[in-house]
């Protein structure tokens, strides 16, 4: 299993994920600056913030499958080359339509998540997969990097130049992956149709997809809507809002490998049930909060639970679907990405309908309860003997 290469490839792929997520999430933290030059209404804003998630979710299935066919090296390399185009186009954007188009293709940066979660387990023994995938998942910190750094840099050199600077970083990592990516990565050539046929009859795939829809969806959604939400609802300064959003993302990211470790040492489903109970409480807190202090407590609770939950779920995926890991990773991670697409739209709709976003957070709690019920069913069926 090429374990001797594991540490190096894990590091390279994790850093590549950081860069991919930096590009994927670049619009949201810069939107307070972009909106000064490009006029957008609330409806357009919610679409612009959510649209990178569409392609970033849909492509996760073919990217996971392709990783098993041609290896992570070439999927990462081609993705970085493709990303150069929407980044360049975004730097020239002058209309909402241009923002939407560039944002759509920035989704490639989010889709590469399924590359590593398919490739990395090949280099490690089963009792280390949870930790390894958790470390790889820390590449999500790329979202926080953009949240922390993009706003203050944009305040100095302008948002267009800030966006264009990403071209250099992406080009460097395309070169690094071309040179150092593992061309001898073990391949798994199981026909996609047969994988889907086997997966479609396994209820665990649907449960894991629902759980990740909530945990990773919360991670993505909060990262997308928090900067503008904090500015518009609490009067927070643009840079401060970016920092607060970055803290949410960083906390969830650094706790992801802890979730993987907990999944390696204990029953991952049981730990996940506890995690979701706390997440439900956090969602209820957000649903009743009207003060920044209470809202912060709710956000931090969601961040902690989302991070741990992400790590726990991707401990379970390879253990349940060893031979269909590429397709399973792609489907589950796709659902997680889609989980980040809907909340910003729901929040905008609910706020316009009721004058408050509180109901949207209560809906998160309801989804958490539904997921908890399915966890109880799986635990009873698989472990309670």
Swiss-Prot record:
One of its GO terms (biological process) is nitrate assimilation. One of its GO terms (cellular component) is plasma membrane. The keyword Translocase does not apply. Pfam families: MFS_1. Induction: Positively regulated by the two-component system NreB/NreC. Belongs to the major facilitator superfamily. Nitrate/nitrite porter (TC 2.A.1.8) family. This is Probable nitrate transporter NarT. It comes from Staphylococcus haemolyticus (strain JCSC1435). The gene is narT.
